[in-house]
Amino acid sequence: MDEKMVSLRINDIPVTVPEGSTVLEAARSAGFNIPSLCFLKDINEIGACRICVVEVKGAKSLVASCVYPVAEGMEVYTNTERVRKSRQLTLELILSNHRMDCLTCSRNSHCELLQLAGDLGIDAVRYANDNMPPQIEASAPHLVRDNSKCVLCRRCTAVCRKTQEVGVIGPNDRGFHTHIGCAFDRDLAEVDCVSCGQCIVACPTGALSEKDDTARVLAALNDPAKHVVVGPAPSIRVTLGECFGLPIGTNVEGKMVTALRRLGFDKVFDVDTAADFTILEEGTEFLSRLNGGGTLPLITSCSPGWVRYLEQHAPDMLHNISSCKSPQQMFGSLVKTYYAEQAGMDPQDIFVVSIMPCTAKKYEVLREEQRLPNGCMPVDVSLTTRELGRMITQAGLLFEHLPDGAFDPMLGVSTGAAAIFGASGGVMEAALRTVVEQLTGAGMAPLEYKEVRGMEGVKEASYELPGKTVRVCVASGLHNVKRVLDGIRDGSLQYDFVEFMACPGGCINGGGQPIQHANVRNFTDIKALRAAALYRQDEGMTYRRSHENPVVQKVYADFLGEPGSHKAHALLHCSYIKQKRYRV
């Protein structure tokens, strides 16, 4: 059926757009940029900030273009004197309630409010509040909130409520006393936050940021008694370049490795290698449950945001989750056991740093359930992509001009299956590549499972295997995870294997990834561009199934025994428990 179109005029230019489009979308298609602040497409469409106002012929007042629908014959004006003065006054009033320490703010190079001030010609703030003190709340291990920089756009509350259905933050009080916080102004550490960090990447200012752990890493690098090992997650190599202005989806693996060496890390390993171990362990666990009558569906445990959601909001499903540690934790476990043994080092002298797309990893590294038999915690510090970007900049490295380097081979060889872990469906596809081949025989299984790829919130597929049908599901974003969980509970959804990721689109869209301007987010499929880069990497890999990785084979032969062995369970598995929820 043909889509119905609507014709209108914008600044006297004829424009034709699909029915249901907003004035903002129509203007964009015609080459007119309408500034906005509170608008995030499909997430926060409330027209509250009034920055995006335009004139519509016949309307009594200016209208918010982000929510105002087009109509046949409409005449719109986006740059009249009335519009410009309204936007400037609105922005001045917003700035009057904003602590402007722009020189030292964590968002000083990519603040939407700062950019708006320049774009709208604000050369003086007539109503500045020069004495506004910081309002810091830093109780959680992953996030710092400073409400003195909050502009009440409600983008953070919308993503927490709608995308994640966690809803731990919202507006408190009324009028001039309105502020964003938790119920009864509780600290974030006291409520049911899952640490996903989606609120941070939604925030247009410096009101929300990850807790910066770079000082701890620099201290370790400067400590001659510490042997400092680093490992980046699969998605980092296709997002780090954005910190330096490279196009979205640029793979910078080689430059990233060189940068890490020049920062002073003693060994640069790859968490992709640990992802291959994850598939061997999780695949073995799945086959054991499938063939031995264990609890199904088996649900993946790679996403700490999802795991925390499970423990707080769905503890009745704890028996379904895999006991495997995440790739980050497996990486640290192998470094402080296998690598320490091979290098003849005391594990206590090894300082492990992970580079992750995820703020929830900062919470995960603190979990006592992860502690190794030798008394060590697997990972000492988890940094986000953004933190690594800042370290590279502060070290004076010209990232774009760095030569390509290679990972240290002992724990630095990986497969295409590990590379795609960073995209929603990647863990499932990686597992299927190994599990299906084990069930059907070498050379009989397909290499790609495109049914589980893509940015849809929920994906389903079934595969006919010898003697059984395997039904799988992939869901990302906790709103979609909740839907699938409800279906599993009531029996309307029947699966054998399920992949859950807390962040929409998976790790490529994690809360620790580079923050893109709302104009980019609203009109570009960032998740798809980043994921496509991972699939391109997969296609070019020598090994594309996790069990083909020669490093994995060697570590099992020389150290772990076999997948699912007693030693593997002691080092690469853990338990998850019901967590206390704050009740209001």
Name each model-derived stretch.
Residues 7, 14-83, 210-584:
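Iron-sulfur-associated redox domains of electron-transfer enzymes in respiratory
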Residues 167, 200, 388-392:
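Mobile "lid/hinge" segments at catalytic clefts and subdomain interfaces of large enzymes
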Residues 50-195, 208-223, 227:
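Fe-S ferredoxin-like electron-transfer domains
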Residues 197-212, 261:
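Phosphate/diphosphate-binding loops
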Residues 164, 203, 339-343:
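Structural motif corresponding to the C-terminal cap of alpha-helices
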Residues 1-3:
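Terminal leader/tail segments of proteins
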